[in-house]
Amino acid sequence: MLIRDNKIPVVQMRFMNNLALINITGRDKPGLTALVTSILSEMDVTILDIGQAVIHDYLNLGILTELTDVTQEPLQGIRAAIEKAGLSININKVDEHRYTQWVQQQGRRRTILTLLSRKIKASHVSAVSVMIAEHGLNIDKITRLSGRIPLAGSEKKTRACVEFSLRGEPPAEFRENLMALAGKLDVDIAVQEDGIFRRHRRLIAFDMDSTLIDTEVIDELAVVAGVGSQVSAITELAMTGHLDFHESLCQRVSLLKGLSVQAMAEIAERLPLTEGVEVLFSALKMLGYKTAIISGGFTYFGDNLKARLGVDYVYANELEVVDAKLTGEVVRPVIDAKAKADILSELARKEGIAMEQTIAVGDGANDLEMLAAAGLGIAYHAKAIVREKSDHAISRLGLDSILFLLGISDREHDNH
């Protein structure tokens, strides 16, 4: 609604029953909601529903009411009092049949759609909204979860997230179509049921290489050992699912024979964390999460991250060492894709946590079973085969954007 020259738009009142939707807009200031409801209380109004939002200091307040007196006199009284406060008001009738339908829809499934990008453009929201409508869903609410974005901020450092609360039953193809749209728009889109477990997860497990750290440790070891190109080629085949993980691991480790523990220590000290890791772990600790590294990588480096980040559990493969040098062998048993999923399930049982309350995050083909087993599986900056087979993917933002999928806003985290 546009307000020009401080003039209040004319109120339209179409009224035949005692149900009315009152919309009030204007520049926000402390006490407005108290003022409005005080005015309504004098008319003996029952509030059936209420919602309020403030965007850039402008108030939009909606109140669904039941009035005991529906003559023009009290309505004009409400109008005059609201306008005297410098606000705009619009009163519309609500059909009793539609109201009854609204009540009966209570308890219907709701879905949360999370839209993430460095900056969110109108074209992004338009495309997503069109697809929501095309699949027969209705948007009940849109909420910004990310912090306020400075106009002069670098796009590489900014992040934006809005959350859509949807009403209705999503058709089977909804998620797949949204994932295709996300790729076209170069954004991330996550869809999940708005159930009791969404904000009550309790255990989160991470792959290590290319998830918690922005590198593949075995490739770093290979460079120092002088076999970088050979190992990188095998790693790529394994992570894209073109080579059995167990076989690829043994092949790569055999090429590291003779590498010193001292060289491993130097690599461990310079492991680069992925974007948002420290922010995420700070929030997870505050929320009381149990954290785990479940990796096909190596315990030596997992233990280093455990100390740096305060991780609760580390499960990874152990490199055999004799006389302070690698033998080129892996201590059995090897942690492969199945083992990862089994470890997650065992950890949940040990901690007394339902699998619906678990989260798994990974990027490679050997993470797929773990992602599928978790209550919330997230493919993080993952290979194409992993994104395609995962329900959720984050490819444009840092690891801390996982908090948005849990419904946690920047404001909530920053205030602690």
Where do the model's predicted regions map?
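N-terminal amphipathic/basic-hydrophobic helices that include classical n-h-c signal peptides
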Residues: 1-15
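A conserved regulatory-domain signal marking ACT and ACT-like small-molecule sensing domains
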Residues: 14-201
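Conserved active-site and cofactor/substrate-binding residues in soluble primary-metabolism enzymes
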Residues: 27, 31, 69, 73, ...
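Short glycine/serine/threonine-rich phosphate/pyrophosphate-binding segments
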Residues: 32, 124-126, 212-215, 367-370
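Active-site neighborhood of HAD-like aspartate-dependent phosphohydrolases
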Residues: 196-246, 250
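Long, charge-rich alpha-helical interaction segments
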Residues: 237, 250-258, 268
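C-terminal cap/substrate-recognition subdomain and adjoining C-terminal extension
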Residues: 258-416
